[in-house]
Every structure is written in C-alpha cells, then in structure tokens.
A protein has these predicted regions:
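Acidic two-metal-ion nuclease catalytic site recognized across multiple nuclease folds
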Residues: 1, 168-251
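Metal-dependent phosphoesterase core characteristic of DEDDh/y 3'-5' exonuclease domains
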Residues: 2-9, 20-67, 87-203
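Conserved Rossmann-like nucleotide-cofactor binding loop
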Residues: 15
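Generic alpha-helical secondary structure signal
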Residues: 55, 59, 79-80, 118, ...
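A short, well-structured juxtamembrane/interface segment
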Residues: 74-89
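A general structural signal for well-ordered secondary-structure junctions
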Residues: 78, 95, 146, 222-223
Length: 251
C-alpha cells in the first residue's frame, strides 16, 4: 500500500523573533491529506500543546498571543514534544506554515527529519496575487474558504486556530498546484504582486518606470530584490514577453 499523502501545517507561538534568544511556548498542528477522489482536504482533529520556553515571556509577545508565564510553568520542554509532532508516523510529505521561515528557525532539520517546507505566504503571492493582503487572517476573510468553522479558527495568534486557518489555505493551494510546485515556490524569495513602499506603493511592478525599478534591484529586502529582478528580466525579453518567466517555468 502506498504511503498516505499528508502535509502537516505547523504554527508556533514563541517568546520572540528567533532562537537562541527566544523559544517556543506553544505549537499547533493540522493535517491536510490527499483523498481517494484526488482532492486535498483537512483530516484529523489537529491539536496544540503549551511548551515551557525556559525563560520569561516578554510583555510585548504576551500582548500578541496572551500566553502567560504561569500558563507554561508546568508544560513540557520543547525537546520532549517537538519530534513526535514534527516527524510523526506515517511521515508527512512536507510541513507547511504561513511565513514558514519563522517556524523553520525553531523546527530544525534534526527535529523535522529534514522535511521540506511549504510557505503558504509565498504560495499565496503566486496563486492569489489580487488579494488586498497576504496575512493569514487577511486571506481568511478575503477568500472565505469553504467548510471553515469560524469559531474553530479563533482566537487568532494562538497555535491551533492559526494552524487550522492556514490548513484551509493549503488545502485550496494543493487543489490548484502540486506539492512539488508549492515546495519550489517556497524555496525562493516571495514574488510580490505590488510595490511595498515609496511613490509607487500599491502599484503593480509593470507600472513603475525603469529608474525606480533599478533602485529596487539593490533593496535590502530579498523579496523586493527578487521581484525587481523578475520584472527587469521581463523587460529585457524574459517573463511574459519572450522567454518564460520564473513563475511560468515553475508552473
């Protein structure tokens, strides 16, 4: 019997931005599986567990997820809970998260058995570029995914509700593109549909002049640089005109 095709969505709540200064205080998960009908759907109940981060939770992050030090004082340690959640049996074909680079900092290859990651933020840029925004919750209310239980996806910024919401985005992405395609998009910087700042803010990249585009080619943000390079290549005869764009090649 072939192994089941399952992707596990992960969401973390932490004490701050990155290890080793900061640590996990909650992990949530929700599986999405390929059915016998060839369609992807949420499967299982998912879940979450609090984690003792081994350090105080700063007020600035308490204000986001509302997890207090006393909530995690008797919780298990990260090294005791991470591996069974991140590398369960049967093995998942990939892990997924919204802005997966954040989760991947804490969910190291040693804990995930080297699993590939799908970043639903990067994939949303490709599949739904017309969205007014690309946060997990913006996509939730702009797309209104079929079958989502509103209350089950609340409160926002807690690990299971966020994983549950992300799983609906992932389900719909997998019904539009392959696992391999989503992983490929996730391994390169985000392809932004609109300019983020400056006098052209909110405009499509094809609308800005050559001088403005040239300035973005050396931007500090890798997503902006990548997108500017993509648009520059299009204007030089690549992209939608002439050679295939990187996005078309991936498709």
């Amino acid at each position: 019997m072939p192994a089941p095709q399952i992707v596990r969505v992960i969401d973390l709540e932490t004490t701050g931005a990155a290890p080793p200064t900061h640590a996990v205080c909650e992990i949530g998960w929700q599986d999405v599986a390929l059915g016998s009908d060839g369609r992807w759907a949420l499967t299982g109940e998912g879940g979450s567990t609090l984690v003792n981060p081994g350090r105080p939770i700063p007020p600035v992050t308490m204000a986001v997820h509302h997890i207090l030090d006393e909530h995690v004082a008797d919780a298990p340690w990260w090294h005791d809970v991470a591996r069974p959640i991140l590398d369960p049996w049967p093995r998942r074909v990939a892990l997924a998260a919204h802005r997966a680079s954040f989760e991947a900092q804490f969910c190291t290859p040693a804990l995930t058995h080297g699993a590939d990651w799908i970043c639903t933020w990067k994939c949303a840029l490709r599949l739904w570029p017309e969205s007014p925004g690309f946060s997990n919750q913006m996509l939730r209310y702009w797309r209104r995914p079929e079958g989502m239980e509103h209350e089950r996806g609340l409160p926002a910024h807690r690990a299971f509700p966020d994983a549950y919401v992300t799983a609906f985005h992932l389900r719909d992405m997998l019904n539009l593109a392959s696992v391999e395609q989503l992983i490929a998009w996730s391994k390169v910087p985000g392809l932004l549909p609109r300019v983020r700042y400056g006098p052209y803010r909110g405009r499509e990249w094809s609308e800005i002049d050559d001088d403005a585009l040239a300035a973005f080619l050396t931007d500090r943000d890798e997503d902006i640089r990548f997108t500017a390079e993509h648009e520059y290549a299009r204007r030089q005869g690549g992209g939608a005109i002439g050679r295939e764009s990187r996005q078309q090649q991936l498709l």
